A protein has these predicted regions:
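N-terminal secretory signal peptides
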Residues: 1-10, 37
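N-terminal export signals
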Residues: 13-35
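Extended, subdomain-level signal for the structured scaffold at the beginning of enzyme domains
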Residues: 36-38, 42-172
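Local cysteine-cluster metal-coordination motifs and their immediate loop/turn environment
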Residues: 57-59, 191, 345-348, 370-384
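A conserved mid-domain beta-alpha-beta active-site/ligand-binding segment of alpha/beta enzyme cores
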Residues: 281-285, 289, 293-362
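Juxtamembrane/start-of-transmembrane alpha-helix segments at the extracytoplasmic/lumenal side
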Residues: 398-410
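Alpha-helical transmembrane segments
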Residues: 413-427
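Cytoplasmic C-terminal tails of single-pass
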Residues: 431-433
Length: 433
């Protein structure tokens, strides 16, 4: 690798961009200089491996990941950067933190048929430490809720040496066993998303698609608890064992928001949710970087900064509405009549007051774009999506406005007047006949 330096992400920029702010504390506690810490972190014999699985997926999260800019995929893994004129090479900033290998990805790896070999290596400890990234929903392969015809399956990760099917459920479960950290990325992998939707009458798809985490609003259990139930009913004893919940020596905790939130990796980390449909690439990249930094002893425990739905607070700590450039219109009770109007789109169905994300503030790619720049928030970062937030383009019944101050009371009055005038004006605009 060339040592040519350019205008890419520096070592200190990389740490800052990852959302980790504890480097100074780490240095103070360890008594090491920055360069000493960098040297200590390097361990070519023990890289941080990334295993990325694709289950019931569309690939949208992978595309978003490839679009990450701060830092970019190329900068992190290869040291390639674009200086505005040509492609350049430099020493990758991630090398300061120890090597990272993307061991497995169904789309990005050089050849297929590697799933089983990767699983075997992971089970044997040959890939330790590794971070497991789950994209796409999991399915009821073992007939806990729905009995499939014999020999059929919903999702395959590949073939075993004997020619039999390697089920996605089996693949992910076995990778969970030795993972240092697990991150679920996208609405489907986190809380089930669109594949787990109902028909409006509470009836689910025969796949009984589920996310890695429970959706308490729709009553859907996450994959860890599903696997535990499968084991208890002896539906797949050769694939799923009791260690699904005894890995940390703790009993099953079914407290809100659900048992799968309390499952822990062997390092004691819960499943981290990178929720959205899909999340922006920078959200995925920076969350994975925080896991890598923690694994290297260079950053704080990511579990200390998660909200109740296991989402990183540095991305999901505020409502989408709070970050929205149209929020001022909301407070004034000024609402858009149609798409293209500059006012608040609450009246057109925006669910920004019911969801958490930084999309309006950070944009989508390199600070550009974002849902509310041209459309409405459909609450894809929240459990309950999509069922609880449909129809997407119908205005909610009533906004929720704080009433503890005079300003809030005045704002509430303005919103009520604004929504009312919007409804009357829309009625006047409606074509007759």
């Amino acid at each position: 690798m060339s040592s040519h330096k350019g205008k890419g992400v520096t070592r200190r920029d990389f740490l800052k961009l990852s959302g980790v702010t504890a480097l100074g504390t780490t240095l103070a506690i360890s008594g090491l200089s920055y360069q000493d810490l960098v040297t200590k972190a390097k361990d070519p014999d023990q890289p941080i491996n990334i295993i990325w699985t694709g289950n019931g997926w569309c690939g949208g999260n992978t595309i978003a990941f490839l679009d990450a800019m701060n830092p970019s995929l190329e900068d992190v893994f290869t040291g390639v950067y674009f200086d505005g004129k040509s492609i350049q090479l430099r020493q990758p900033s991630i090398s300061d933190l120890g090597l990272i290998n993307l061991v497995y990805h169904p789309i990005l790896m050089p050849q297929d048929s590697m799933a089983y070999a990767t699983m075997e290596q992971a089970l044997n400890g040959e890939l330790d430490p590794y971070v497991l990234v789950v994209e796409g929903t999991m399915f009821d392969e073992f007939g806990l809720y729905y009995k499939k015809p014999s020999g059929s399956f919903w999702c395959s990760a590949g073939r075993k040496p004997d020619g039999s099917v390697l089920l996605c459920d089996e693949f992910v479960f076995n990778l969970m066993k030795n993972a240092y950290g697990v991150a679920a990325t996208g609405a489907c992998a986190t809380y089930g998303g669109i594949p787990s939707t109902t028909n409006g009458l509470g009836k689910r798809s025969p796949t009984y698609a589920m996310g890695m985490l429970d959706d308490p609003y729709r009553g859907i259990n996450g994959f860890p608890y599903y696997a535990y139930q499968v084991y208890q009913k002896d539906l797949a004893p050769d694939i799923i064992d009791e260690n699904i919940y005894s890995v940390t020596g703790s009993s099953i905790n079914t407290a809100y928001p659900g048992p799968s939130y309390h499952w822990k990796t062997k390092s004691g980390l819960p499943i981290i949710s990178i929720a959205a449909d899909p999340p922006a690439g920078d959200w995925i990249m920076r969350t994975l970087v925080s896991l890598v930094l923690y694994a290297r002893g260079l950053g704080p425990n990511p579990a200390d900064d998660l909200d109740v739905f296991n989402r990183p607070k540095f991305f999901y700590g505020n409502e989408t509405h709070q970050n929205c450039p149209r929020a001022g219109f909301f407070a004034e009770g000024k609402f858009a009549y149609e798409f293209g109007d500059p006012q608040c789109t609450y009246s057109l169905g925006c669910k920004g007051t019911e969801a958490n994300s930084p999309a309006p503030r950070l944009g989508w790619i390199a600070g550009v774009g974002g849902c509310t720049r041209g459309g409405v928030c459909i609450a894809c970062t929240a459990p309950g999506f999509p069922d609880l937030y449909e129809p997407f383009y119908a205005p909610p019944n009533a906004p929720t406005v704080p009433s503890t101050t005079l300003f809030a009371a005045a704002a509430a009055a303005g919103i009520i007047v604004g929504v009312g005038s919007y409804a009357l004006s829309r009625r006047r605009r409606a074509p007759k006949g």
